[in-house]
Amino acid sequence: MAEEKKAPISVWTTVKPFVNGGASGMLATCVIQPIDMIKVRIQLGQGSAASITTNMLKNEGVGAFYKGLSAGLLRQATYTTARLGSFKLLTAKAIESNDGKPLPLYQKALCGLTAGAIGACVGSPADLALIRMQADNTLPLAQRRNYTNAFHALTRISADEGVLALWKGCGPTVVRAMALNMGMLASYDQSAEYMRDNLGFGEMSTVVGASAVSGFCAAACSLPFDFVKTQIQKMQPDAQGKYPYTGSLDCAMKTLKEGGPLKFYSGFPVYCVRIAPHVMMTWIFLNQITKFQKKIGM
């Protein structure tokens, strides 16, 4: 009987990091969605952040900033649930194997790389839907897909292009996620330890400060891969049915040849502004959710 009573607690203990991670990511996305929309349009060559914002308000209205929100929430429910939950379990196992000692930076980075790959594989279909929905209004009328929501996009993509098309661009998505999570997760833990132990920061100051550092590191590590991923996912065939890029490497080489290395960092200020607050709010929400659960004994 005693073993039967422990089972639900064990299941919740395992599931909790995934639930908390997904919930915190979805809450953060609701706030960051407008900045993410602007970032995508900058990468698609629509102009500066100021001009894009002005044109969207003038021509499309406030609702345009939230186009693709359903896909963004679905992405967090899959990608962030998987990556943050996996990272928590991986680091716990690593600490256990390390006799309870704090992990060195390289082990945190490896856990972040692995968690990012897992999350990207799970969240790739939702990420594809999000990119296409955000880019739709930038296309000529005849080429627009007119998806009504994330589930409509996933259904249409499966029906028109095949189920495997849901993982189009999965390669660069996984690489980008590995780079982002290595920067985000490892630097957050390392910064939090330093700010708390060496600088004497309080709990909230530590969360905010470490989140800002991890957000910048995540942006710097991942933007080149994000740029390539976006180009691959939004590309369409020409009149002869030929795509502009044969794959991620071809896209990267053509971009390097035509625009130089800095082309990969198009929209970096906006991307950094988008990543850092999202990371900060994800950690803050996660911190508050965890505190609330402890308070009520969950």
Curated annotation (Swiss-Prot):
It is found in: Mitochondrion inner membrane. GO terms for molecular function: dicarboxylic acid transmembrane transporter activity; tricarboxylic acid transmembrane transporter activity. One of its GO terms (cellular component) is plasmodesma. Its main location: mitochondrion. InterPro entries: Mit_carrier, Mito_Metabolite_Transporter, Mitochondrial_sb/sol_carrier, Mt_carrier_dom_sf. Highly expressed in flower buds and at lower levels in roots, leaves and stems. Optimum pH is 5.5-6.0. Solcar repeats lie at residues 12-93, 103-194, 202-292. SUPFAM superfamilies: Mitochondrial carrier. The chain crosses the membrane at residues 18-38, 68-88, 109-129, 169-189, 208-228, 268-288. PROSITE patterns: SOLCAR. It holds the Pfam family Mito_carr. The keyword Repeat applies. GO terms for biological process: dicarboxylic acid transport; tricarboxylic acid transmembrane transport. Keywords: Membrane, Mitochondrion, Mitochondrion inner membrane, Repeat, Transmembrane, Transmembrane helix, Transport. Catalyzes the transport of dicarboxylates, such as oxoglutarate, oxaloacetate, malate, and succinate, and of tricarboxylates, such as citrate, isocitrate, cis-aconitate, and trans-aconitate by a counter-exchange mechanism across the inner mitochondrial membrane. Substrate preference in reconstituted proteoliposomes is oxaloacetate > malonate > malate > maleate > succinate > oxoglutarate > citrate > trans-aconitate > cis-aconitate > sulfate > isocitrate. This is Mitochondrial dicarboxylate/tricarboxylate transporter DTC. The lineage of its organism: Eukaryota, Viridiplantae, Streptophyta, Embryophyta, Tracheophyta.
